[in-house]
């Protein structure tokens, strides 16, 4: 994408995606410090939210915590299902940009009425119902998003949870300037027109790879930005039965694929189904590859940015309004004060 080209610059979505580079560079990792003692006191952390406020921020935090291997237990679930859980021994973070997502507010009402004393909010607005019920709330600095599809807020939410993980591990959160440059490059790099044509004409776009939240978030963004059907195939799910109903008019995007499984994927999907397979990766793969820089411990942010770039190109090629989906709403399910 190119903000100096009118076919991109007319969309707030493109502007907000590109703003993430400065947001990353200027992020203050100390913002999570004041929450750490309460989390450690509980000994467990539960991250809830709906849609984009949970998928990448929460799941990436869990992935990183498991990679480190020595942190307290961290879990995530949507707020409605979380009503069925005993969260009394967890510090609970509820993420909602509006601060008035119905499911989050309802969960916090229940927990607060039961005497829960470790409820925390993560929002983009002050003076919200969520903030009024939380013991403490961090308000994002990214500013209001004009496009329906959340982008820069997703990145800042993830950075905030990332800072929680670093604090809990007693590690410094370094390298954000380099990450900013890598994300910027991923957002601006040219994508081969042949790839975009294949994706533009695909009946379904599948995303396959690690359960870090990045790929699942791209699956959601495919619906909002391109209006195309999509599905997230976690891990090696792509090799375990779904090939039975796949079609040659569909495309799979592998994000940083497991090298050990590439030959089997080629056998099952390319040769067996006859479908197109594309990869987004920091290395050359067995498939047509959108090459990105290796982001190290922050690599999932670079993957997400590259995926955004692809989705914008598809949307522009389809000639649709990237900012305003027909049915999707900025606040999916709003809490109404009675």
What kind of region is each of these model predictions?
Residues 1-24:
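N-terminal amphipathic/basic leader segments beginning at the initiator methionine
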Residues 6-13, 44-50, 200-214, 220, ...:
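Glycine-rich phosphate/diphosphate-binding loops and the adjacent beta-loop-alpha structural elements
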Residues 29, 33, 38-184, 188, ...:
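Glycine-rich phosphate-binding loops that contact phosphosugars or nucleotide phosphates
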Residues 179, 187-231:
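ATP/pyrophosphate-binding catalytic subdomain of soluble kinases
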Residues 220-251:
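Active-site rim loops that border cofactor/substrate pockets in soluble metabolic enzymes
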Residues 310:
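Hydrophobic, well-ordered secondary-structure elements that form the walls
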């Amino acid at each position: 994408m190119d903000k100096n080209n009118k076919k991109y610059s007319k969309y707030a979505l493109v502007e907000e995606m590109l703003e993430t580079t400065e947001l990353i560079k200027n992020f203050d990792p100390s913002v999570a410090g004041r929450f750490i003692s309460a989390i450690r006191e509980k000994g467990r952390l539960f991250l809830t939210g709906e849609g984009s406020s949970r998928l990448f921020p929460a799941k990436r935090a869990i992935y990183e915590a498991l990679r480190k291997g020595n942190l307290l237990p961290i879990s995530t679930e949507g707020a409605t299902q979380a009503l069925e859980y005993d969260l009394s021994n967890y510090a609970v973070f509820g993420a909602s940009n509006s601060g008035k997502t119905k499911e989050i507010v309802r969960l916090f009402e229940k927990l607060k009425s039961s005497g829960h004393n470790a409820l925390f909010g993560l929002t983009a607005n002050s003076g919200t119902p969520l903030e009024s019920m939380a013991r403490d709330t961090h308000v994002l600095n990214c500013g209001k998003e004009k496009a329906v599809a959340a982008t820069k807020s997703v990145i800042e939410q993830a950075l905030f949870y990332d800072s929680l993980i670093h604090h809990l591990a007693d590690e410094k959160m370094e390298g954000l300037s380099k990450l900013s440059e890598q994300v910027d490059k991923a957002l601006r790099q040219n994508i081969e027109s042949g790839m975009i044509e294949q994706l533009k004409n695909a009946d379904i776009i599948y995303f396959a790879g690690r359960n870090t939240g990045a790929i699942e978030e791209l699956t959601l963004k495919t619906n909002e930005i391109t209006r195309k059907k999509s599905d997230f195939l976690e891990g090696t799910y792509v090799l375990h039965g779904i090939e039975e109903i796949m079609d040659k008019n569909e495309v799979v995007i592998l994000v940083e694929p497991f090298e050990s499984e590439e030959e089997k994927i080629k056998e099952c999907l390319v040769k067996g189904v006859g479908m197109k397979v594309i990869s987004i990766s920091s290395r050359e793969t067995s498939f047509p590859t959108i090459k990105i820089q290796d982001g190290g411990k922050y690599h999932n942010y670079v993957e997400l940015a590259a995926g955004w770039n692809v989705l914008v190109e598809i949307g522009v090629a389809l000639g649709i309004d990237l900012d305003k989906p027909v049915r999707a709403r900025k606040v999916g399910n709003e809490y109404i004060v009675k």
